[in-house]
Amino acid sequence: VVWNEKIFLNVADGDNLELWCLDRNNGQPLWKRFLSSGNHRERKQNMSSPSPVTDGRHVWVMTGTGFLRAFDFDGTEVWMRDIQADYGPFGLNWGYASSPLLYENALYVQVLHGMRTDDPSYLLRIDAAMGATVWRQERPTEALRESPDSYTTPALLQYDGVTEIVITGGDAVTGHDPETGQELWRADGLNP
């Protein structure tokens, strides 16, 4: 993600996952921060697939190993979460790759899985300043075989004064209330 003269990257460096802040003018690192160990390949991807997000003062980054961390623009860590420790292992066939969505001081993190787990898929709202979970909304699916898994990123939909968090995957598209997580609508049958 780029903000003014800074570029933020989620980087796999050997066994480690790191957040790099680069100078946009010359590509030189301004700082690097350790996120987690345990980088590995899941088929064709490593654990640095999710993109960082920023509001211009802070940067948040999720790893495929389940760590979600917040830093200020000087590289000082503000908070850290381990989503897998809190809610159970990710059960995706190809590894976790969804980026968080930042909207009005909240991060929306989706875990749509089912290939390697019987645990339900879910959407989280996390307070961006403190890192606490505000709510967790399960997202059921009737998807078969590999279809429960999704590597997409939540999207923001705004129309007629209404704001929704839209999730695609698990053979469905769903719209959710950003305040409560409640599913407002569902379009099924994406994988006949």
PLM feature spans:
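Noncatalytic, solvent-exposed loop/strand surfaces
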Residues: V1-P192
